[in-house]
Structure formats: structure tokens, C-alpha cells
Amino acid sequence: MSHPINVFSEIGKLKTVMLHRPGKELENLMPDYLERLLFDDIPFLEKAQAEHDAFAELLRSKDIEVVYLEDLAAEALINEEVRRQFIDQFLEEANIRSESAKEKVRELMLEIDDNEELIQKAIAGIQKQELPKYEQEFLTDMVEADYPFIIDPMPNLYFTRDNFATMGHGISLNHMYSVTRQRETIFGQYIFDYHPRFAGKEVPRVYDRSESTRIEGGDELILSKEVVAIGISQRTDAASIEKIARNIFEQKLGFKNILAFDIGEHRKFMHLDTVFTMIDYDKFTIHPEIEGGLVVYSITEKADGDIQITKEKDTLDNILCKYLHLDNVQLIRCGAGNLTAAAREQWNDGSNTLAIAPGEVVVYDRNTITNKALEEAGVKLNYIPGSELVRGRGGPRCMSMPLYREDL
């Protein structure tokens, strides 16, 4: 592989993918603090891990290399200097107000000799009771005395799609919607700065976690070697799309058109890929609830290097035909178009498919009506269980970050 990253489509045969196996961070979820951590329910860890292992094994059975974020992050801590730098940065972004408490956490983390154990600890979160003689020094600490964590867990991390996104040979290292998830992007920073697989190699960055406006990978879809679709959503700002479009054009990644899909700000469809995914050259899943009010903007580069933004005035299928150079496209509706089934199965990520080859996808087995519609459209389905993983509000695409796809 001349480039460590090669993603010029949503559907090219998947060769390498990054996952995160859920761990103790899920056991640090508590009913009183679910909203703070962007969860609606508490998955049963043992079952969630079994479901995730089934997902990984299915991918391996298709000759796909599976790498884990936690392993790459541990391997990126290549020496003691980088290791200490990681700990210092992690603590600076952990919102610990008390300097003495921060120093106790630093000592705790420095005492962990094994890098993989250190990464797992950073992901799981740290409870106040783990610190010797924890003292409340600030009014905020006293008001939040009942809150059990000095560092919040990262239960959303098994959705590896979001904290960065691969584009062509490059990446978008994202600025996340919430403080809870922003720390997740530290792992991506160290992986791409220091891991031997990527360090010193051509991996251009079209967005950086230090930017002031938010964007998440669930809103970033690579429709072709010329077209990127990005959702304007609960998690991604329009301003971020302008920034990333300029960077994509300036860095000559090969993409000529950025399509911005305005899907509104809703928890139930927080990202574009929860309501729209590409599954074949001319086939797409879509949640019918977004169709009526969907507005699409095209962003192109002008001759002077500035960007041109145009509001598209056609139907979604015609817009897709225009930019993907197709005669026809097929929009396969979640729930087969039935409003009740569509709402239920979209909530359970029926639209969130992962294409592993043109016309072949991974889906949750629970979304029976949508799955039947996909099969009737000639799509090959690979089923995984999802009774626990889905409680985090994400499906197969959310849980995977392609690092390498074959070109179409």
C-alpha cells in the first residue's frame, strides 16, 4: 500500500477497517448522567462485546483487516516523552478544576506501565474514589460532590466513525459536538502523528480538532472520487463544511464537489449516515422523514481558488444522478416507507448500513422490514446482532472507520 489511507468511495471493497471493542467505559454509565454522556440507555457490556466480536469476525471472514483504535493508540506512544505528552494533554482537556486532583490523576496514570492498560484507563474514565485523599477545592466541585467521576468515561468511542474521517488519502480530524466526545480525538491525533503505520507518510489533514466549529464523521460520506457529501446536522455546523471544502480543494485531494445535506438538528437523526447511506453504485438507503424538507447545497472551487455555493433546486434522486453521472438511482426507504416502521427502524439504525463491497452491506438483524426491502432491491446482506450495541444509537457504519478501500 503506497498510501496508508485510501478511501475514495463508500462502496469500494473494504480492505482495512478500524474498530473499538467496547470496554469498561460502558460499565461507568449511570442513569442520572446518561444525557451528559450522550446515551439514552445502558448496554449490557458482556453482550455488547459479544455482538461487537461477531461484527469483527464477520469482517475478517470477508478478508478485511480489522485493527483496533485502542491498539493503535497504545502503539503510538512510542517512547516515554510521547507517553508523558499524551498524559499531560489528556489531563489538560479533562476539565479537572483542582490542580491537586489533576496531579493525583497524573500520578495514577504515570504508575500504569503498560501502554494498552493506560489507553483503556483513559477510555474507561476515573472515579473520584480511585484518588487517594480526594479533596474538593472549588465551589463547582462542592456543588457536584455527588458526581462520581474526576474524568468522564468515553462510552461513545465504539462509534469510531465520528472522531475522525478518512477522505481520499487524507483525514478529517474532527472537532466534536460535545466536550464529552472531544477528548476522543486525542487518540486520532497521536495515532496519525506517531504510529509507525502513518507517521511521516502522506496523510493530509483537511480538518483539525483545534478548529472552533464542529464536524463529526457520521456526517461525512465519500460518494465518489469526485464527490463528498456532508450533513448539516445536530453535530456538524455549516461553517465547518465551508472550512473543510476550502481545505479539500487547496490540498488537491481530487474531490471536485461537496454536497451539503441540511437534515436539521435532531437527536433521532444526529448524523447524515443515520438517515442516508450509499450501498451500491446507484442504490442508497434513506429515511423517508427527511425527504420532504431536505435541502442540498453544492460547493465547488472557482477559478480564483475561492468557493462557489449553490442551492440545488431539484429532487434528491436527480441531484445524485447529476453529480454521480448516473441515469437513475434507487432510494431504498427505511421501514419500506411505512411511517411507523420507518421511525422504529431508523431509531434502531436501519439506515446505517456499512458497505463492504458494491451492493454488499452489513446490517443489524433486528430491522426486518428495512432488511427485506434491501434484499428485494438486490442488495447482499450480512447480518449482525444488535440488541445491546444499538442502545448507543449507532449501527455498522457508525461503528467502523475504513482506512483502505479498493478503488472503483
Curated annotation (Swiss-Prot):
The active site is at C398 (amidino-cysteine intermediate). It comes from the Bacteria. One of its GO terms (biological process) is arginine catabolic process to ornithine. The keyword Phosphoprotein does not apply. Pfam families: ADI (PF02274). The keyword Glycoprotein does not apply. Keywords: Arginine metabolism, Cytoplasm, Hydrolase. It is found in: Cytoplasm. Its EC number is 3.5.3.6. It is an enzyme of class 3 (hydrolase). It catalyses: L-arginine + H2O = L-citrulline + NH4(+). GO terms for molecular function: arginine deiminase activity. One of its GO terms (cellular component) is cytoplasm. Pathway: Amino-acid degradation; L-arginine degradation via ADI pathway; carbamoyl phosphate from L-arginine: step 1/2. Belongs to the arginine deiminase family. HAMAP family: Arg_deiminase. This is Arginine deiminase. It comes from Enterococcus faecalis (strain ATCC 700802 / V583).
